[in-house]
Design a protein with these regions (language model features):
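…; additionally, a secondary subgroup of soluble metalloenzymes is captured
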Residues: 1-453, 463-613, 617-840
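Ligand-binding pocket scaffold of soluble enzyme catalytic domains
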Residues: 460
Length: 840
């Protein structure tokens, strides 16, 4: 510890004052190295007097007149004056002088070889401060030489806890700017600047007669790019390409993948990109050569621009480096700047899927149509939903407007209109029978005879494709067993009739004023629905989701205690979509609904001892972003109808207009009511006054009529789950090249009991020094085929001397908890490039 320097001094001084004869000891500390420490020196038989340049006469008088018996250490924090200027010269002649060489003391105390004492002496100004000296000690360096001493000094000035040049550079880059950097100013203050540039040369191959921090960082970014861009570098960049690419790649990967410093990396990347005129040079390269480059956000901008061009031309077969557009989108999202372009890549991926699959081909037979929609075609609605979900996150959508128009045209004209017409024609041919359970039979089929407590969550306008996303989320939960099916909804497909159909009943009917009645009773409020439910299930309850959100556990549990059936009414999608001001937020509402329902199920299961849930809806919806022109609306419905909406009309007579279909209320409800329900054949709307025109329901389409039913059972006991593991496939025991690729495999597919995770994979020495770049692996593959879960990683090793007799390891750490999950011993058999001149 630093205190040992003072102990050595104290011991020496105490030995001087050990005799009974009075002694005066003068200590001229030329560099004021011990000015901060002098008062902490504990002398056993003497006192300390502070000598200043202007109090020499007083000190002389004090020592020779006022106190002539006490031993004194006279400390002067300056060099000994010449005899002419030293008024204590005659006193010193009969006293003793003390000399403390801090460099010698430090060298001795730290166990530094005597040959490195000049290094300590060169930087002795650094050690004049007690706090700096202590921090130097705290680094606990084992082997001292010029390099380790200088790096340690820099580490202290950068406030680093370990002596590492990589950490020094990391602090310099992340804690201040590239111009007028405060740490470089500190280095200059203590004469460390040339040492810093020497270290930059040794570690990263940066050597410049007029070095600057900006040029060092340009060297690192250009060298990194040169190893991932598969073409010749621009002439202007070539002087910045370093042969120490392994060290540079390792440092850059660690910095960009750091949770703490990733954002600062992004800022530096932008500065360098502009400084080297990156946009101009990269635009001239073939885009295929840029696919693996991930240290400039500008690369993603160019790739996105290329994908946009392909999709605008509906070129769904386009590939880069053998990768399809969806594969590129997935891969680039996982790269460092993927988080910055997450929305853009999701937009493009969903646009691709829409272009590839959105051109609907009619299906014969309503049962075939139902099967195809519930198994695959629903995904087209999902592609559209997620396209706009991410599109709406962009601040500037200009670049994507042509694709948006293409997606809108395909969805509206080549998919939605076609499938709706196909649906209505096939449904009419089948006399309105899809073969599915009718929504009005829901209670009788699924609730009435349930032996355990069941919670029915009715989410207003939760259409089938949105429910399927929720189902997939439930399925991925190891504590949930979920299945999904569809019911045939009612016409009109709107809230009053849909909610009534889910209640137990003997009859459902319209009053003369077109109110929906269940067993002759109103059913529009929660209280009215609960009264009806209790007539069939005494131990039952109806509650609104919003009233439960902030409940404490005891209050939540009380809702379910003693109940056989609980209906929970959730309204997120319809509440947002039915208002003109917020209808374009409906896809955001869908995501929120999924999360709210999932969280509700988990919460009720864990806090209220209830484990069986059924999620369903009153109806679905149709949503189109572009507003319908007035000329495209079906006129005449409002004047002839007693009850009318944009997608339905109920009246005593048919609406005589092209593109309008009809059925009777009696057919829908199983009664003798002959009133006519009219609805558009395609996805258009009636010309009526009312709310928005983008979000509509009430008509007859798969999106409106196929009501989802998710059956969820939550396990009381937790299943044993594990994280997806990775293993080394390559039979490698020796590394012979600075660039090495290895094959790995994700050992099991992600499932309900095997959860996805991410790993950091790199090489280390026996002393835990990181010797390669760091690869981030996201273990999220679900393929059953093992070969499809294999992947290859590239490692760039530091260009340094490796000892073949020492142990080195390939290691993998779980990125979430920093637990080591893989350690594979290897031999490093690489000839040192600097020795043999392999790289010029």
């Amino acid at each position: 510890m630093a205190e040992l320097n003072l102990k050595q001094i104290t011991d020496k001084l105490n030995s001087e004052f050990a005799s009974d004869i009075r002694k005066l000891v003068f200590w001229y500390d030329a560099n004021a190295e011990f000015q901060e420490d002098i008062d902490s020196i504990e002398l056993e038989n003497a006192k300390v007097l502070h000598l200043e340049p202007d109090n020499q006469f007083y000190i002389k008088y004090f020592l020779e007149r006022e106190d002539t018996t006490t031993n004194y250490l006279v400390y002067a924090p300056f060099a000994k004056p010449s005899i002419r200027d030293n008024h204590l010269a005659d006193t010193i002649r009969y006293s003793k002088e003390f000399f403390a060489d801090r460099a010698s003391l430090l060298t001795l105390d730290l166990g530094i070889d005597e040959r490195y004492k000049p290094v300590i002496q060169h930087y002795i100004k650094f050690f004049a401060n007690k706090d700096r000296t202590q921090k130097f000690y705290d680094l606990e360096i084992e082997n001292f030489n010029r390099s380790t001493i200088e790096v340690a000094l820099m580490s202290v000035l950068c406030k680093d806890k370990t002596a590492s040049f990589e950490e020094v550079l990391r602090s310099i880059l992340t804690d201040d700017g590239l111009q007028d950097n405060k740490y470089l100013a500190e280095f200059e203050k203590y004469d460390l600047l040339s040492a810093f540039w020497q270290q930059a040369d040794v570690a990263f191959g940066y050597n410049d007669p007029k070095p600057t921090l900006e040029k060092l960082v340009i060297t690192m970014f250009v060298t990194y790019a040169a190893k991932s861009i598969h073409t010749d570098m621009p002439q202007a960049w070539k002087p910045f390409i370093s042969y120490k690419f392994g060290n540079i790649i390792a440092f850059m990967d660690n910095l960009m993948n750091s949770y703490l410093y990733g954002t600062r990396f992004d800022e530096i990347s932008e500065i360098i990109y502009n400084a080297i005129n990156g946009k101009n040079y990269l635009e001239k390269m073939e885009v295929e050569t840029l696919v693996d480059c991930n240290n400039f956000a500008g690369v993603d901008e160019l790739l996105i621009s290329w994908i946009i061009g392909r999709l605008e031309n509906e070129d769904i077969g386009a590939k880069l480096n053998g990768k399809t557009i969806p594969e590129l989108c997935v891969e680039r999202r996982k790269q460092h700047f993927g988080k910055n372009f997450r929305s853009e890549y999701f937009i493009l991926q969903n646009a691709f899927d829409m272009i590839a699959e959105g051109k609907y081909q009619p299906v014969s037979g309503i049962k075939n149509l139902v099967k195809e929609y519930t198994e695959s075609t629903y995904k087209i609605d999902r592609y559209y939903r997620y396209f706009y979900f991410y599109f709406d996150k962009l601040e500037d959508t200009t670049q994507f407007e042509k694709i948006r128009e293409l997606v809108e045209n395909i969805y509206t004209n080549e998919y939605l209109n076609r499938i709706t017409v196909n649906w209505n024609n096939e449904l009419a041919d089948a006399d309105g029978e899809t073969g599915l359970t009718l929504q009005r039979d829901f209670f009788a089929r699924h609730i009435n005879y349930s032996k355990d407590r069941v919670v029915v969550i009715i989410s207003d306008a939760l259409r089938f494709e949105v429910a399927h996303t929720l189902f997939e989320k439930m399925q991925a939960d190891e504590k949930c067993n979920a299945s999904i099916g569809a019911m045939q909804g009612v016409l009109p497909s709107y809230t009053p009739l849909g909610m009534a159909s889910l209640l137990p009943h003997k009859t459902i009917e319209y009053s003369p004023s077109y109110d929906v009645l269940v067993d002759g009773k109103a059913c529009s409020s929660t209280e009215q629905r609960e009264a009806i439910l209790k007539e069939y299930k005494v131990n039952s309850k109806c509650v609104q989701f919003d009233s439960m959100k902030t409940m404490k556990q005891a209050d939540l549990r009380s809702i379910f205690t003693g109940q056989d059936v609980v209906y929970i009414y959730h309204n997120q999608i319809d509440a947002r979509g039915d208002k003109a001001a917020s209808e374009n937020e409906v896809f955001t509402a869908c995501e929120e609904a999924i999360e709210e329902i999932y969280t509700l199920i988990k919460r009720v299961a864990s806090q209220a001892n209830t484990y069986h849930f059924i999620v369903t809806a009153d109806h679905g919806f149709i949503y189109k972003r572009d507003k319908i022109q007035a000329t495209d609306k079906i006129a005449g419905a409002a004047s002839k109808s007693n009850s009318v909406g944009q997608r339905y009309s109920i009246s005593a007579e048919e609406i005589k207009a092209d593109g309008v279909c009809h059925t009777t209320v009696g057919k829908v409800l199983g009664s003798v009511d002959e009133r006519i329900v009219s609805f558009p054949l395609a996805s258009d709307i009636f010309k009526v006054a009312g709310a928005g025109q983008n979000f509509v329901h009430g008509g007859c389409s798969p999106q409106e009529m196929l009501v989802p039913m998710i059956d969820v059972k939550v396990d009381k006991g937790k299943k044993e789950t594990s994280l997806a593991e990775i293993a080394l496939v390559s039979l490698t025991s020796k590394i012979t090249n600075l660039i090495t690729t290895l094959d790995f495999v994700q050992t099991e597919p992600v499932s309900d009991v095997v959860k996805e995770t991410s790993y950091r994979v790199y090489f280390i020495s026996d002393s835990n020094e990181k010797i390669s770049n760091e690869n981030i692996v996201i273990a999220d593959k679900k393929d059953k085929d093992t070969t499809k879960r294999m992947f290859r990683l590239r490692f760039n090793f530091k260009n340094k001397k490796y000892d073949k007799s020492q142990k080195y390891y390939l290691v993998a750490y779980d990125d979430k908890n920093d637990i080591e999950v893989l350690r594979h011993e290897i031999i490093m058999d690489i000839a040192f490039a600097d020795d043999f001149g392999f790289f010029g």
